[in-house]
């Protein structure tokens, strides 16, 4: 568990599953999905089926909840793109619109990046977003990340093409960036 004032990121507990299911699956077209890879279908999962995945969610090192003042507002985590070369990517979703543009995502990502570079022999941490999610691009810029790739017009959503964006931070950039201290 890590804390930055009222914001906490911590492993998912079994007691969190009902709230997480509600945030992710209770609505057919949730507002958050308009920003989190909306070009991929959001498939409804019943609560019973969601509970069948609890072993992959509860107390895992790679997927945590984000809390503000004790309220779960999102999830954050990482996945291996290519483990033999220590290449991982991070992901975040703030499910509750009331918490968008409040700096919570930036702070949570900063905490996770610190955790990853401190506990793993990584040379790079990155994430992929799309040009329709300008807030996520700005988060990376605020954290000193580099736009490493812009794959033009490869994401299609609501009748428009968007770019896929890759942001990355190298260990030496993390070490020299005072906001990570």
Would you name each region that the model predicts?
Residues 1-19, 26-27, 63, 67-181:
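Acyl-donor (CoA/ACP) binding surface of acyl/acetyltransferases
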Residues 17-21, 35-36:
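Short, charged low-complexity linear motifs
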Residues 21, 51-54, 113:
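A generic alpha-helix structural signal
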Residues 29-52:
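Conserved GNAT-fold acetyl-CoA-binding loop/helix
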Residues 54-59, 145:
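Short loop/turn motifs at secondary-structure junctions and domain boundaries
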């Amino acid at each position: 568990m890590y804390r930055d004032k009222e914001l906490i990121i911590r492993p998912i507990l079994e007691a969190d599953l009902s709230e997480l299911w509600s945030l992710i699956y209770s609505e057919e077209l949730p507002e958050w999905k308009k920003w989190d890879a909306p070009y991929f279908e959001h498939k409804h999962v019943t609560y019973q089926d969601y509970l069948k995945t609890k072993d992959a969610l509860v107390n895992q090192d790679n997927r945590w909840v984000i809390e503000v003042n004790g309220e779960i507002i999102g999830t954050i985590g990482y996945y291996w793109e290519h483990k033999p070369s220590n290449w991982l990517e991070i992901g975040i979703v703030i499910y509750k619109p009331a918490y968008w543009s409040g700096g919570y995502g930036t702070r949570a990502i900063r905490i996770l990046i610190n955790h990853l570079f401190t506990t793993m022999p990584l040379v790079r941490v990155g994430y992929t977003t799309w040009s329709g999610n300008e807030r996520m691009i700005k988060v990376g810029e605020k954290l000193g990340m580099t736009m490493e790739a812009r794959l033009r017009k490869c994401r299609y959503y609501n009748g428009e093409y968007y770019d896929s964006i890759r942001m990355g931070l190298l260990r030496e950039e993390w070490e020299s960036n005072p906001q990570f201290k």
